[in-house]
Amino acid sequence: MKERILTSLIAAFVITSLQAQTTPAVPRLVVGLTIDQLRSDYIEAFSALYGERGFKRLMREGRVYCNAEYDFINIDRSSAVASIYTGTTPYYNGVVGNRWMDRASLRIIKSVDDPAYMGVYTSESTSPQHLLVSTLSDELMVATCGNAEVYSIAPTREMAVLAAGHAAKGAFWLNDETGKWSGSTYYGSFPEWVTTYNDRDGLDFRIGNLVWGPYLPVTSYKYVTSDAKQLTFKHDFSDERTEKYKKFKTSPYANDEVNKLVDACLTYTNVGKDNVPDLLTLSYYAGNYAHMSNAEYAMEIQDMYVRLDNSIGDLLDLIDRKVGLNNTCLLYTSPSPRD
């Protein structure tokens, strides 16, 4: 049974300032944005709440592929991201899910576990060893004789590593216990610019002051059921001890945190600064807060999409300032919309 991706498999977006002839044949930067839990029906249902810089710009100036499918079942973050960036199904790429039973040891293993490598800013040992084929980033590194700059940034470990592939220069994700951007020794030395970000502006310094409330007036949110707990909402993370970063990663602020590290990446690396094409693989989150039901958190999911729209707009503006959208190709897609 095939499962349809409820958003487009690839929505390709190339800004050309309305003059196609000014677009270089090879972009300086390719950005792959995978939005976890994104639903095309929600994109459409909440469209009246959006500004002009995010979804509407992508739809207006990009190309949308609507009739796309995953050619396998039991889709989750790992199997979907592996398939997106390898162009193959789990039968070939080896990643059948977030976790599975290892036949040799009869133990449950996670998709990016690898005891051969140490974690940086994390105790988790990680590599893409279970990916059995090359990825887009691997092929780009081969094609450029290793001269491309390839980085992956995501809230979750599996999305960061599987999108990065084998040959990227770094894959970074938010630590569930500390909020620091983490990595693996598999990718070599940990970049100084990420260490500096962690030490000076890490999430752990700011999370106590973050409060998530409605971005728009509550009367703007029309889809509120009788099961909704209240007519407004307010979530903060200051009282959480063990779960605050996990809950943070299911809030729209996780997408802003990705953008902040992208800003540092574009500032302190050579990404997009020469004619050798570079690749950034990014991940956002668009699911329910703390994985609760839509009925209970109907207002939050609408606000999630409003803030997601803003985050996409901020990302496009950031890339335009640092690299130039006329030098950039951006594609966005989503795994199947479920946890």
What do the predicted segments below correspond to?
Residues Y332-D339:
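Conserved small/polar residues in nucleotide/adenosyl-binding loops
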Residues I43-Y92, E149-I153:
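Short, structured active-site-proximal loop/turn typified by the sulfatase FGly-forming signature C/S-X-P-X-R
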Residues R39-A45, Y70, T122-S127, K247-T250, ...:
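Second-shell loop/turn segments in exported
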Residues T89, G97-V276, Y285-M292:
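His/Asp/Glu-rich, glycine-adjacent segments
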Residues V26-V30, G62-Y65, G146-E149, N275-D278, ...:
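Loop/turn elements at helix/coil->beta-strand transitions in domains of secreted/extracellular proteins
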Residues P24-I43:
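Mature N-terminal segment immediately following signal peptide/propeptide cleavage
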Residues M1-A25:
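Bacterial Sec-dependent N-terminal signal peptides
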Residues A168, D278-L280, A290-L318:
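Extended hydrophobic/aromatic segments used for targeting, binding, or gating
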